[in-house]
Amino acid sequence: MKSLSILGSTGSIGLSTLDVVRQHPEKFNVTGLAEGHDINLLAEQIKEFRPDIVSVRDKASAGLLREQLGSEKPEILWGIEGAAAVGAAEGSEMVVSAIVGAAGLVPTVSAIKAGKDIALANKETLVVAGQLVSDLVKEHKVTLLPVDSEHSAIFQSLSGHRKEDIERIILTASGGPFRHTSAEDLRHVGPEKALKHPQWTMGAKITIDSATLMNKGLEVIEAHWLFDMPADKIGVVVHPQSIIHSMVEYIDGCVMAQLGAPDMRAPIAYALAWPERCESGIKKLDLTQIGTLTFEQPDMERFPALRLAFDALKAGQTFPAVLNAANEIAVAAFLDKKIGFTDIPAIADRTMQAHDPYTPSGLDEYLAADRWARDTAKTMTN
């Protein structure tokens, strides 16, 4: 029986994780939950999974949750400190890091320092503070397992192979809903259209990131830290069917790929059960029903966010943290209809150009870069 704490339990990844847990009561139990928005859903999760400790967005939410639960309730905390406490709580062996955005960094670091294995869905943890997190993983001898479908595919395709035999890793991208949309028409895209992803069901922020290709850019940075690969050994190919989740090319010309239906429960189940496997509940793949798999080069002129991510990775220092923070602010402004679709990468670019980079010496300095970028980007969205 593996004990889990889930950071971001009411989000898309959190819900899929609990669905996998629900299928395997003999394998997994939930000791901690943290969420930021949906108190009613969290209350239902608490009643079903009976965790020992939970965290919510703020003190007011904690009061509302206590009222809903009555006398039988777990320890209830709030804020970043509360989520960090859930991540570090005794009793859990693995922490599923699925809080959206840079807000997931501090709780994930807390979990690593407490010696918890990490199932990482929060790519921003590595984008913002990749060097720090990598060093902490080694220091505390924990296992970091990717939950992103692309990185899970690479992890599986690397199994049993030597690093020196790798030619490059290839991340696949669906291309989003606008891969055939002209640059002029992209200027007039609104949130309603951008939130309709052709393959995946995800939360609003990551769906917009997928439409701009920023999500793929952040995944490039994540792959660098997960697999210790330089930028010039990480490629991206558009694969609209989202059946091949990513690939590894070896020096002999052979390519290993992982295929499956586009359902996040598969990489989640793989991370939870590793080094074993367990039933995920996804639809089994039938290639004869799909018929054709196609591939294209990404267009970095129409979708400059991907280029910005490569630039940030190559520049290093605090640039990835700044890119991520500026993008989060711009996406929120787009969803609020304050800016246009093409303004999202433009604001990220302008924020990076205004940044004076430095090499962070600790968590506080990464967070300072994040705050600076948010403040700077906000001035561009008003």
From Swiss-Prot:
Binding site for Mn(2+): D148, E150, E219
Pathway involvement of the protein, from the record: Isoprenoid biosynthesis; isopentenyl diphosphate biosynthesis via DXP pathway; isopentenyl diphosphate from 1-deoxy-D-xylulose 5-phosphate: step 1/6
Entry-linked SUPFAM superfamilies: 1-deoxy-D-xylulose-5-phosphate reductoisomerase, C-terminal domain (SSF69055), Glyceraldehyde-3-phosphate dehydrogenase-like, C-terminal domain (SSF55347), NAD(P)-binding Rossmann-fold domains (SSF51735)
Sites where the protein binds NADPH: T10, G11, S12, I13, G36, N122, E124, G203
UniProt keywords, alphabetically: Isoprene biosynthesis, Manganese, Metal-binding, NADP, Oxidoreductase
One Pfam entry name: DXP_redisom_C
Uppermost EC category: oxidoreductase
EC number: 1.1.1.267
Reported cofactor(s): Mg(2+); Mn(2+)
Binding site for 1-deoxy-D-xylulose 5-phosphate: K123, S149, E150, S174, H197, S210, N215, K216, E219
Keyword presence, Acyltransferase: no
Stored PANTHER family: 1-DEOXY-D-XYLULOSE 5-PHOSPHATE REDUCTOISOMERASE, 1-DEOXY-D-XYLULOSE 5-PHOSPHATE REDUCTOISOMERASE, CHLOROPLASTIC
Biological role: Catalyzes the NADPH-dependent rearrangement and reduction of 1-deoxy-D-xylulose-5-phosphate (DXP) to 2-C-methyl-D-erythritol 4-phosphate (MEP).
The protein's name in its UniProt record: 1-deoxy-D-xylulose 5-phosphate reductoisomerase
